[in-house]
């Protein structure tokens, strides 16, 4: 079963999703962390963030795994690094790249397939998981 939580920045999506997942015994899919991991990989590889092809190629070439309270990118725990101001800024740039978006949507769907997930983030209920059983939209 998939439960999605959408809404604007600062609405409390991540907090609500984490709490709901814990309460239901579901896994939590932090989609923002996925974009941050792509941004981190781009910065670590000195990829020009204005080069959409290179950014998309980076997104397609990395491995992103979720473990309990940790984000693993290419075998490295990047949980702390992806929360930096630099990664946040870079994430907003890479998230606007269509190739990155396609790859992240593919990965989100693949990750959730056959699992019970609470997922939050941009367009989760409308685009990523349009057939989700429960969809919420939070406002600040």
Predicted feature residues:
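Conserved lysine of the Walker
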Residues: 13
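Hydrophobic anchor at the beta1->P-loop junction of P-loop NTPases
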Residues: 3-5
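Short active-site oxyanion
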Residues: 25-27, 116, 134
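Hydrophobic positions on the alpha1 helix immediately C-terminal to the Walker A/P-loop
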Residues: 16
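Walker A (P-loop) phosphate-binding loop of P-loop NTPases
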Residues: 10
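Post-Walker A helix-loop "phosphate-sensing" segment adjacent to the P-loop in P-loop NTPases
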Residues: 21-31, 44-47
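ATP-dependent small-molecule kinase phosphotransfer cores
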Residues: 33-117, 123-128
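Conserved phosphate-donor/acceptor-positioning beta-strand/loop module used by diverse small-molecule
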Residues: 130-140
